[in-house]
Regions:
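Long, positively charged amphipathic alpha-helical accessory segments at protein N-termini or as interdomain linkers
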Residues: 2, 14-15, 76-79, 85-105, ...
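N-terminal lobe of the biotin/lipoate ligase/transferase fold
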Residues: 1-100, 119-121, 168
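Conserved active-site carboxylates
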Residues: 112
Length: 262
């Protein structure tokens, strides 16, 4: 934690934000919900006893090896029906950060980050609404940085260190992420306020999308049946669009209605 504290305390001062560094907590997202944090503030914990991922999964991480944190945003310019764009923004910020290391990340819908067929980052986003607009978003991120040994029951974990063959400075990785998030978030706000038809965020997300235009085996989360299909795109609300191989039918799936077979 010391190497994080020294660099991130100065980074927080320069950017006029609060970065709270904790040894242990139940969940950084939970803490963000319980205390009053401003836009751009961050909670980082070495250990989370109840770290959460998508689909209700837990997120485990060895102390001192990775980055587990939450960032608070106030996207009051974003309509609730377009909230999936926050997921795109966060996923792209992580992907941009990993790409800076020379590795090649992809985004597994909706917002897991993969290197090859292995998961390096999980993202959990929790939004609050005020009328038709978002008023607050908490972006929870678990980024595997230097951990190389994982629980054997986990299906396909990896880390930056395992993929690159060397360790990384966690503070530098976090600072790069925060800078990329600020850039992507600024891009999101500009696109929403100007109501641009062409979206760089949407284009970049598709370009990073795991298994896009590739035939793949999936599980229908509603029936448990395996099927083969090809991801063709993402609808504005975030639904995954898949062309079914044996019928040619184009179907859309909500989160938890489809699983990848990896």
């Amino acid at each position: 934690m010391l190497e994080l504290k020294e660099k991130l305390t100065e980074f927080a001062r320069q950017n006029e934000i609060q970065i709270e560094l904790l040894d242990q907590i139940d969940s950084t997202n939970n803490r963000a919900a319980q205390k009053c944090y401003g836009a751009g503030d961050v909670i980082i914990a070495e250990t989370q006893s109840a770290g959460r991922g998508q689909r209700g999964n837990s997120w485990s991480s060895l102390p001192g090896q990775n980055l587990t944190f939450s960032v608070v945003l106030q996207p009051d310019f974003l309509l609730a029906e377009r909230q999936f764009r926050i997921s795109k923004t966060a996923a792209l910020a992580v992907a941009d950060t990993i790409a800076d290391t020379g590795l090649t990340p992809s985004i597994k819908w909706p917002n897991d980050i993969y290197i090859g067929n292995r998961k390096v980052t999980g993202i959990l986003i929790e939004n609050d609404l005020s009328g038709a607009y978002l008023c607050r978003s908490v972006i929870g991120i678990g980024l595997n940085v230097n951990q190389t040994d994982f629980d054997p029951t986990l299906p396909n974990p990896t880390s930056l260190s395992r993929e690159a063959g060397h360790t990384f400075d966690r503070a530098e990785i976090f600072i790069r992420f925060y800078q990329h998030l600020a850039n992507r978030y600024r891009m999101l706000a500009e696109e929403e306020i100007s109501d641009k038809n062409a979206s760089q965020i949407d284009t970049d997300y598709l370009n990073r999308l795991y298994r896009l235009n590739e035939e793949h085996t999936f599980i229908d989360g509603r029936t448990g049946e395996h099927f083969t299909g090809t991801i063709t795109g993402i609808l504005p609300g975030g639904d995954l669009e898949v062309r079914i191989a044996n019928t040619g039918q184009l179907r859309t799936f909500l989160f938890k209605e489809i699983e990848y077979v990896i």
